[in-house]
Amino acid sequence: MSVVEQAQRARTAAAALAVATRADKDAALHAMADALVARTSEILAANGADLAAGRDEGLSTAILDRLALDAGRVADIADALRQMAALPDPTGEVVRGSTLPNGLQLRQIRVPFGVVGIIYEARPNVTVDAAGICLKSGNAVLLRGSSSAARSNVALVSVLRDAVAGTGLPADSVQLLDATTRDSVKELMRARGLVDVLIPRGGAALIRTVVEEATVPVIETGVGNCHVYVDAAADVSKAVAIALNAKTQRLSTCNTAESLLVHTAVADAVLPPALAAFAAAGVTVHGCPQVARHSTAVLPATDEDYATEYLSADISVAVVESLDAAVAHIQRYGTGHTEAIVTDSQSAAREFVARVDAAAVMVNASTRFTDGGEFGFGAEIGISTQKLHARGPMGLPELTSTKYVVTGDGQLR
């Protein structure tokens, strides 16, 4: 079946989802969760085949870890669907309303996008998360995962489709595109009029390709060259703890800090304990000459280092002369994801927040908090680094648009 045919089926399914009740959608989510647990052995067999093929192809340990499933991970994925069912349904929510002078009742309400396309890399959990959040928000979804997870995704989507159909909603609410050819990606990116929005989740190269080549509207997510700036008025112990957590709590996420900027006034106090903490955690520091004075283990930082989203046990560190210099550095190298300042100065915090252009700005907190769950939004489809249509963690409301409903009693203009 071609991508166009799948997209047409998705549009038909989306029409049914648009009028489905919350009870209908929540029942489908619970059925999906139960089916994943019941058919775990089938899913793990497919995943085992993907892992074996990946090892033969020389995939890195990090990629294999993201690809791997076990019974515990499948149970966690199922639990995430149940938690999704407990979240409020965004569709039909009244965003604003008023009675006009002529007596017309005006309401702006949330409605589903319709058909959402998602292109992503070797994370089978994204297959289920994306299917769940799209269904909950009333959208049909077209999933295009990576070839390295092809067998796992086929098994997962088979389970999900059977479960959805068993509750009376269309099986075509969830569809998987062929991952063995790049043609499916090209067709999906050009299915304007059939696909309402495209969301890429993955590395910089994937996101750049989709943004540059798609004719379907795109919500750009993900790439995070995040900074922690330690201000002249920072508490040293707090600064070291935040920098260490932001870098090492999890290395391979888009909200992980990749750069540490330290005001020259506190460099001698902050850098020795910070460098020692990074060394103890196995993190390689790429630093400017002022940083290298404090440790022979520091590697020289290049312009490329400052621009790199490492997603590994590496961090670039630079000493800056002022808050102005820190902001200028972030403007040059940042990706608009998450930036943090550590300071006891309210005026410095206000200035940093006002001047830094990012989806999230942290004051005396780790960059790792930029997350739908941590923000209390529940499920998220990704973290948008653009300004239209959504910015920051994208929860259920961000997978909707709005329509105006005007109710009258025979008014004429």
From Swiss-Prot:
* Endpoints of the signal sequence: none
Tell me the route in metabolism or biology where this protein functions: Amino-acid biosynthesis; L-proline biosynthesis; L-glutamate 5-semialdehyde from L-glutamate: step 2/2
Which class of enzymes does this protein belong to?
Answer: oxidoreductase
| Biological role stated in the UniProt entry | Catalyzes the NADPH-dependent reduction of L-glutamate 5-phosphate into L-glutamate 5-semialdehyde and phosphate. The product spontaneously undergoes cyclization to form 1-pyrroline-5-carboxylate.
Q: Which HAMAP family match?
A: ProA
- Known Pfam families for this protein? Aldedh
Q: What main location does UniProt list?
A: cytoplasm
Q: Name one GO cellular component term.
A: cytoplasm
Q: Which gene encodes it?
A: proA
* Keyword field contains Amino-acid biosynthesis: yes
Q: What is its EC number?
A: 1.2.1.41
UniProt KW Nucleotide-binding keyword: no
* Protein name per UniProt: Gamma-glutamyl phosphate reductase
Subcellular location field: Cytoplasm
Keyword field: Amino-acid biosynthesis, Cytoplasm, NADP, Oxidoreductase, Proline biosynthesis
The source organism is Salinispora tropica (strain ATCC BAA-916 / DSM 44818 / JCM 13857 / NBRC 105044 / CNB-440)
